[in-house]
Amino acid sequence: MCQDYDMKIVGEKPSSDIKKNKELYGDIAEYEREKANGNIGKSKKLGQILAKEFVSVCQKDELTVSEDYSENLITQKVLLLSFTVMAGLEEFCPNISVANAARSAFFDELNVLDKELFEKSSDTGAFSFYYLSFRRGTEVDRRVGQTFAMLC
């Protein structure tokens, strides 16, 4: 007979992991409420608009390789700009469900508009460093600047 010695007994309160996931991803009822009132649709449009603006900014002369700008510096500028969009959505959307819908639409539209830029702007390693700086809550601008300098 098979024994399961590592079985854990769960108490009546939800675990901290469940609470943390709900904070990060929202819940189904919240999503349905936001969808019904039109906020999900609006946030998807916002994500698409932001992607178009992002591509426009990134294709300007100051974000192309030249004597003054190396490939790595350009990549880091793109990552920082992409992170800024993500942090702005998280900060200014009314809740995480709306922010996640806008975030998904941003990356979906970016992938359609410019695959190379999409790949440059979604480096999860660099994003982790930026999010650590952002979520600390104090001196965010200084910490994000230090992160940018470190990655360059």
Locations of the language-model features?
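Short runs of predominantly hydrophobic/aromatic residues within well-ordered alpha helices
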Residues: N21, S43, G47, A51, ...
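Short N-terminal edge-element motif at the start of the domain
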Residues: K22-Y69
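N-terminal interaction modules that seed assembly of large macromolecular complexes
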Residues: E53-V98
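Short secondary-structure junctions and interdomain/linker hinges
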Residues: V57, D61-V65, L113, L117, ...
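Mature extracellular/secreted ectodomains of secretory-pathway proteins
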Residues: V98-D123
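Low-complexity intrinsically disordered segments
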Residues: S122-C152
